[in-house]
Swiss-Prot record:
InterPro entries: MPN, RadC_JAB, RuvA_2-like, UPF0758, UPF0758_N. The keyword Metal-binding applies. This is UPF0758 protein BPP1850. Residues 103-225 form the MPN domain. PANTHER family: DNA REPAIR PROTEIN RADC, UPF0758 PROTEIN YEES-RELATED. It comes from Bordetella parapertussis (strain 12822 / ATCC BAA-587 / NCTC 13253). The lineage of its organism: Bacteria, Pseudomonadati, Pseudomonadota, Betaproteobacteria, Burkholderiales. Transmembrane segments: none annotated.
Length: 225
């Protein structure tokens, strides 16, 4: 049930957060606190509901640009920027964990990071997580962006960036918008080509994660590397 604007202005979600913790609030209520006020004919909690519905939940909101958010009627630049900043902070918490932890020992963390980075994308993107000798994240970089069904990946560019960042290993990830997370024959062939190119400069390809919405698949776990 959504709250009337006067009750929201009185701080009901805020008071509950202070007394019982943020975990007691629903997703729309948490968004309402970031938005602070609603728009014409829609209080802040209702606006939170609308955002989640329009973008397919928190996963869909993650990584949404201010311009995309402003498509929502009444959502101006200020609200869109605040919301985009909050969502980007959420994404960066996963990146911070990868900087501190061994990626090989934390496959679930890697999959969650890749899903957060790619699960909401409408066209194919490929990213590379460049890792140091302790398998901690140095940097995550986009290496390809394509269409709904494909992204052109150049192994030489991935190798060049690995050398530039002094990486000892890396993890690739790409998304299948609107499809399944299963590796295609082309995915397998390209992955093996990249692995061979990296091996020439003593850089190890640890995994290639495929993302389709909320689903992720490890090509290493499936024996495709």
């Amino acid at each position: 049930m959504s709250l009337p604007e006067p009750l929201l202005r009185a701080g009901w979600p805020r008071e509950r957060l202070l007394r019982h913790g943020a975990a007691t609030l629903s997703d729309p209520e948490l968004l309402a606190l970031a938005l602070r006020t609603g728009v014409a004919g829609c209080n802040a909690v209702q606006l939170g509901h609308d955002l989640l519905r329009r973008f397919g939940g928190l996963r869909g909101l993650l990584g949404t640009s201010p311009a995309e958010l402003q498509v929502v009627p009444g959502l101006g630049t200020a609200k869109a920027c605040v919301l985009a900043a909050v969502l980007e902070l959420a994404r960066r918490t996963l990146e911070e964990d990868l900087v501190r932890q061994d990626a090989l020992a934390n496959p679930d963390l890697v999959r969650r990071y890749c899903q957060a980075a790619l699960g909401h994308r409408k066209v194919e993107h490929c990213i590379a997580l460049y890792l140091d000798a302790r398998l901690k994240l140095i940097i995550c970089a986009e290496v390809a962006r394509g269409t709904l069904t494909q992204a052109q990946i150049y192994p030489r560019e991935i190798v060049r960036e690995a050398l530039r960042h002094h990486a000892a290993a890396l993890i690739l990830a790409h998304n299948h918008p609107g499809g399944t997370a299963a590796a295609s024959a082309a995915d397998i062939a390209m992955t093996r080509q990249i692995r061979q190119a990296l091996a020439l400069v003593d850089v190890r390809l640890i995994d290639h994660v495929i993302v389709a919405g909320a689903a992720t698949v490890s090509m290493a776990a499936q024996g495709h590397l």
